[in-house]
């Protein structure tokens, strides 16, 4: 049914479409309306020169120059994309490193790669306005610095699509950020109403949304499998598709230090693996984090070729509570980039 839905109550929705209004009743509902780019008060995207991330899929034109505002995951991926197209790119970084919250060494590796491609990094600059200026735009920052370019793209986060759903009629509660509150079954405070994906306020990853859908189906069908596990968002693997690729999972080194937790950190460069030399791409590294007392694998970060693929090995180890000894006892393919994981475990 193509239309706009809104709740009439906890067991009924109204759907307005070109064919008129329909009412649907049910024992269970899944809200998966996603999110949209966050637009601050100081900016008015026009879809031509001042863009949101949605306006860039695909870009209507290949800009000569572009200012990217926002240095999180989405922002750096657009920096990679537009610089690959040959655009002059300036990244406005509100802090002193890109990818705040990520491994500082991984962020530094990406910054070096960006600088090598001619990307300009404007650090410690918080954008306060993006304005049209002739045939281009100007990004104004709180410290007086300005960036002029033919285009600008906002990449400063997202907000949930909950407007128009009439959630109050169903009694569904939101959190302080406006996302739908869910429990470990992805169920809201109203029995039979579930939420998944970006609108749930958890990790905004397709893999997480798909797994949430699976867990919801299991809960609805009364799955009582002995191996059933609730979602642990702290153990979700994620990847950043730049060059180099960056991927991580589990406990971060900085997070452990901030909490005073003792960890063992082992870092191995890809240059130590024959496969990296065969590829003539020795850049990047594998970082493995484990418990020094038990040897349990707690997390890891990978920077380099196929990082998004290789992180799955560490993700499995983290989820299954494996130890570094388990990795050492595994017969990996040779030559393979994954051998760096063995070296890190050793």
Question: Which residues fall in each region the model found?
Answer:
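Feature captures the FAD/FMN-dependent oxidoreductase FAD-binding
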Residues: 1-28, 121, 128-138
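Short loop/edge segments at beta-strand edges and connector loops
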Residues: 1-4, 9, 33, 52-54, ...
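Core beta-strand elements of the Rossmann-like FAD/NAD(P) dinucleotide-binding domain
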Residues: 19-28, 142-151, 189
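Glycine-rich dinucleotide-binding loop and its adjacent helix/turn
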Residues: 31-91, 120-121, 168-185, 189
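A short alpha-helix-loop-beta-strand transition element characteristic
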Residues: 36-38, 173-175, 223-235, 261-266
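FAD-site-proximal beta/loop scaffold in flavoenzymes
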Residues: 46-62, 146-225
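Rossmann-like dinucleotide-binding cores of NAD(P)H-dependent redox enzymes
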Residues: 57-58, 63-67, 73-138, 142-143, ...
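Flexible, glycine-rich terminal cap/loop adjacent to redox cofactors
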Residues: 236-346
